[in-house]
Amino acid sequence: PHLHWGEISPHQVWHASACIGKDDDVEHFHRELAWREFSHHLLYHFPELPRRNFNRKFDRFPWGDDKDLLACWQSGKTGIPIVDAGMRELWQTGYMHNRVRMIVASFLTKNLLLHWHHGQDWFWDCLADANLANNSASWQWVAGCGVDAAPYFRIFNPVTQGQKFDSTGEYTRAFVPELDRMPDRFLFNP
């Protein structure tokens, strides 16, 4: 929130974190800070970003509009453990790790084929750190229609993502307690 309210500048954050050293975590943090600034630049120069595809050729994409699928995604009841954990964490805490944000966004847009606006609007309503510029640019990135988008055919496989980033199942089980007794080898295989 300190960046959001201008209590500290991105330059100050960059410099202070650079003084820590040059490890992978600092470099990753700098990339995220740069993405934040890039997103703000985009929104300033393209104020329609929250409502229109940056890449206009996606305006004709045949998005679905299944309200039941959207409700399942929003409530964390898709049957896909890592997706359900992320969506329940979002609802319960107002937070979600960036990797899980990408997984649930990819699932909404690439697996359920629901318009990225639905996800953007839900994140805006639920995230404690909601930011219009980041939210809009990130959703378009995942959906494949943004300025620096992931290719439309890039899909985050929620099964392998769960196995890779929650290999012990600790995160998933924390938010999907009905899977507490599920053996690890079956946890991410819906």
Describe the role of every protein-language-model region.
Residues 1-190:
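C-terminal catalytic domain of photolyase/cryptochrome flavoproteins
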